[in-house]
A protein has these predicted regions:
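Amphipathic alpha-helical segments of tetratricopeptide repeats
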Residues: 1-10, 39-50, 83-94, 124-128
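Alpha-helical protein-protein interaction scaffolds
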Residues: 1-3, 10-17, 21-24, 28, ...
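Alpha-solenoid helical repeat architecture
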Residues: 8-21, 49-61, 92-101, 131-139
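"A position-specific structural signal for the A-helix of alpha-solenoid helical repeats
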Residues: 16-30, 57-71, 104-105
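Composition- and surface-driven signal marking solvent-exposed, interaction-prone regions
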Residues: 39-40, 56-58, 78-83
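Short coil/turn linking the two alpha-helices of tandem helical-hairpin repeats
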Residues: 51-52, 71-73
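C-terminal non-catalytic interaction modules
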Residues: 76-164
Length: 164
């Protein structure tokens, strides 16, 4: 069955396969399996699938990379990844307030509860601006931050907010 699945997946459009990988990465984040998410990220990079994503999903993928490394407590690497993410955003147009806020957090020195509360507050304020509201629909970032503040499982918080 597994070999038949590989054949079927290999026959799909590479951009669709990349999208599927991003969806599975999100579910790995959601269910607290960051090691598996990192394996998928590395596989996507090795196969060049990250280059098959459109601009929007590439931004989402890059944000997931930051989130996974935060979950794994790879803080030194996180700073470099945040710098690379900001350069990518600047090359591809003007970064939104949402993107700048998250990149600034991941580039930061402190990831304690106060820094998370500050990030949550800033993003909550940004969420009320109509031009950036759509960014919160793709990534449940506020729930993810709440998960890190409270220590509750991410999936539990999503259920509490009746998301996914």
């Amino acid at each position: 069955f597994e070999s038949e699945m590989k054949i079927h997946i290999n026959s799909l459009d590479p951009s669709y396969v990349a999208f599927l990988h991003v969806s599975v990465i999100y579910n790995c984040i959601r269910f607290a399996i960051p090691e598996k998410a990192l394996d998928l990220i590395n596989r996507m990079n090795a196969l060049g699938l990250d280059k098959k994503l459109d601009k929007l999903y590439n931004k989402v993928f890059r944000l997931f990379v930051l989130m996974v490394h935060f979950d794994l407590k790879n803080y030194r690497l996180l700073r470099n990844l945040a710098e690379a993410h900001l350069r990518y955003l600047q090359r591809n147009g003007k970064p939104t307030r949402f993107e700048k806020c998250l990149t600034r957090f991941f580039h930061g020195i402190s990831f304690d509860k106060d820094a998370l509360l500050q990030l949550h507050s800033e993003l909550t304020e940004i969420q009320h601006h109509n031009e950036e509201k759509f960014q919160f629909e793709y990534i449940q970032i506020l729930s993810w931050i709440e998960h890190h503040i409270t220590g509750q499982p991410f999936a539990t918080i999503l259920r509490k907010h009746q998301i996914g």
